[in-house]
């Protein structure tokens, strides 16, 4: 976590969609990039389900159906994959619940579930302010507040410290409640505490950590329950323990438990024997406990003022959600403002990055021209941008053999084929019962080599991959992916010859050549990385880069320092026939993360044919039928086409990124049959989803041009390609 002075809070000020009413006592969970909020309230209890997309900054109200639960507050709310469970809470003043509901978020379908009672004893009583934590296939319920009175208007509070275990069925439904026999001293009764579960990587014993809460007075004690031995203990901690509090939030990211907000003593820590020890206030203090070392670290103290409104104001009863390494905070009771008949609640949404982002995937090529690249990389969740850099050493630009022959070298690495294209498979099958909606995946960069059947044609290692973008595609993420059709049993759809899948391939790298660039740039020293720029999205059109100032090896910044002023730097154009190395790093509120692995691409050389386009794959009795359209820019007469299949070899097993290709077709036709026997030797590429890889290239009078790569996704990697 960044030092306290480097905390970079962000308030989300621009969003769309129906924003939920400000409230307190609500709960939130995360499903991938979605923050899902339910319950809570202020002037009445809310019963809507609100969803916030952290990528698009959009709020929406899903159309839920089924056994829709009543609105509740201070309830239990956990997420298991795409299943959400709601337990208990206050449904109206003085009336609490012990009902359990399940939401299948993939269908927005609610269902009321009825778990079996414990083998001995009663099920949990109605309550609010309890903790409800998930680990594996079990939920753990601890403590809360019950109403002893049968009359909801006559509230007689009873603090609880009971402990229940709820076993879940796989996918949907529950088995029942049980009351585990625990050892050691049980924590005192409480409500509005927090409980999280953490398991060290090197020792597989999960622990539940309970912190704070309310039992007539606020608490600051920390308890640990070993979920294997069911032993309670009070771990000894180091550092400054946060003030006693309730209605705070606790979130685990990595090995840290982050505590934010809540009700704390009004006079700080010196409240013993004070006449004001019953006065309380909201706080915006922020601390974390290292769960491996049991050491507390204060990031924002209770006494630390915020005159610039640069972080969330004091609050309680808010929600906090961890998405990746980013924490989101929404709403809650305002710590200062008051109203006659209701609390004043915060309307703001904040987030805080707790770590620098991880390295993105290698830069992947979509399109190459003589003086530009269109590149992409896989998205990194919860980042604010990407720094793209390139490196080139023009003194070491390698010449290649004559590019007039088919690319069918035997074994070994073939530099021109370092990068495969990204493909989109458009399903043209009209029968919706046989295929599901396509799923998206990206093709990662990789090296490769070629292997062919005996052939009288000369070997050539000068062919690389490039093809133009399809004219009807856009530059959004959906254009840079394979799409997979699967039946209900997770198999590839069997397509008859008359019903085909369309493949539009985007690109690969370009051919090496003996030609010398006509306008060479100034020679750069090796390992000098120049900025291409900072990009909001995970795609970039690269035609220029910024030259380094004299004496500098890199423009990378440390921490969250400002980015360079590119207007003061000189630009340099890309030149034909030149190899460029690329790397990319993600940026968030903590600064610039580590760079990706390197990728190398080469700008095109004029005169070679473009890549074949509109590739189609369909199954037939012999195997599969592979067809394509001629290049849109043949640059002369097309003399022949070559098609290749990535095959299994010991070399690929040792280095999966080094694909070996076998030529399966050479001729003038724009189609070929790939037999079942050939497919039996196919290599299954696991770069993203399991896939069989084909490459197709065209040859004119000057030689072979770049190839189009197609990844034929396999729904079940354990089955043969045609099973």
Curated annotation (Swiss-Prot):
GO MF term list: transcription coactivator activity; transcription coregulator activity
Annotated segments matching region Disordered: 398-472
The Kelch repeat ranges on this chain: 34-79, 83-130, 207-255, 257-305
Signal sequence, renumbered to the chain: none
The keyword Nucleus appears for this protein: yes
Compartments (UniProt record): Cytoplasm; Nucleus
GO biological process, one term: immune response involved in response to exogenous dsRNA
Gene3D superfamilies the record matches: 6.10.250.2590, Immunoglobulins, Kelch-type beta propeller
One Pfam family of this chain: Kelch_HCF
Polar residues bias: start-end ranges: 419-433
Keywords of this entry: Cytoplasm, Kelch repeat, Nucleus, Repeat
Keyword Transmembrane: no
Gene Ontology cellular-component annotations: cytoplasm; histone methyltransferase complex; MLL1 complex; MLL1/2 complex; nucleus; Set1C/COMPASS complex
Domain Fibronectin type-III: 357-436, 516-606, 608-720
InterPro entries per UniProt: FN3_dom (IPR003961), FN3_sf (IPR036116), HCF1/2 (IPR043536), Ig-like_fold (IPR013783), Kelch-typ_b-propeller (IPR015915)
Assembly and binders: Binds KMT2A/MLL1. Component of the MLL1/MLL complex, at least composed of KMT2A/MLL1, ASH2L, RBBP5, DPY30, WDR5, MEN1, HCFC1 and HCFC2. Interacts with TASOR.
Protein name, per record: Host cell factor 2
Originating organism: Rattus norvegicus
Gene behind the chain: Hcfc2
